């Protein structure tokens, strides 16, 4: 009778050992998934850094460097703007003058000066970038939700849930910003 007890104990120990090995395999797979997510996130951040927001001053400086323009041509722009503001009231009231004024504000004075981006184009560029960021955040949220399924460690689980909440809130903020720009 003791022989049967030994066999059942050995069988239970064998099953317990196999379960522990399987758990270790699952933990390893989860760690590998988290590492893959980290590396892909770092790669995305590197590619998204090319879309870093720039100020108008930076854009103008880049345009000047690209075209090798001296800064004296930039000094003409405030003078031209001042001349437009000094136009007589009779011309300002004329309905034909208003479209010409708005066109002249966005037109180039010479081939050497950087042009301003019209509001429509700028808004389109901003919306395009925000939609790209939003789609990448949604993909990250999906990957985080998949990673939650395999995690057994409570600290990692809490961290992933926290990051998903941040991700969802950021997506909502970007979508509301897009709606306000439209």
UniProtKB/Swiss-Prot annotation:
The lineage of its organism: Viruses, Riboviria, Orthornavirae, Negarnaviricota, Polyploviricotina. The gene is NS. Belongs to the influenza viruses NEP family. Interacts with protein M1. May interact with host nucleoporin RAB/HRB and exportin XPO1/CRM1. It comes from Influenza C virus (strain C/California/1978). GO terms for biological process: exit of virus from host cell nucleus through nuclear pore. Changing residue 105 to A: 90% loss of nuclear export. It holds the Pfam family Flu_C_NS2. A motif (Nuclear export signal) lies at residues 96-105, 122-132. This is Nuclear export protein. Keywords: Host nucleus, Host-virus interaction, Transport, Virion.
């Amino acid at each position: 009778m003791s022989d049967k007890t030994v066999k059942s104990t050995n069988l239970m120990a064998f099953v317990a050992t196999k379960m522990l090995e399987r758990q270790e395999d699952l933990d390893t797979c989860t760690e590998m998934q988290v590492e893959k997510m980290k590396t892909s996130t770092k790669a995305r951040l590197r590619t998204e850094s090319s879309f870093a927001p720039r100020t108008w001053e930076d854009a103008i400086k880049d345009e000047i460097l690209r075209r090798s323009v001296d800064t004296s041509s930039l000094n003409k722009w405030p003078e031209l703007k001042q001349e437009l503001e000094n136009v007589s009231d009779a011309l300002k009231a004329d309905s034909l003058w208003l479209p010409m004024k708005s066109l002249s504000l966005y037109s180039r004075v010479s081939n050497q000066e950087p042009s301003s981006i019209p509001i429509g184009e700028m808004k389109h560029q901003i919306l395009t970038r925000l939609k790209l960021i939003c789609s990448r955040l949604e993909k990250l949220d999906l990957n985080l939700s998949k990673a939650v399924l395999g995690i057994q460690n409570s600290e990692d689980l809490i961290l992933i849930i926290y990051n998903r909440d941040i991700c969802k809130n950021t997506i909502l903020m970007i979508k509301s910003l897009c709606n306000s720009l439209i």
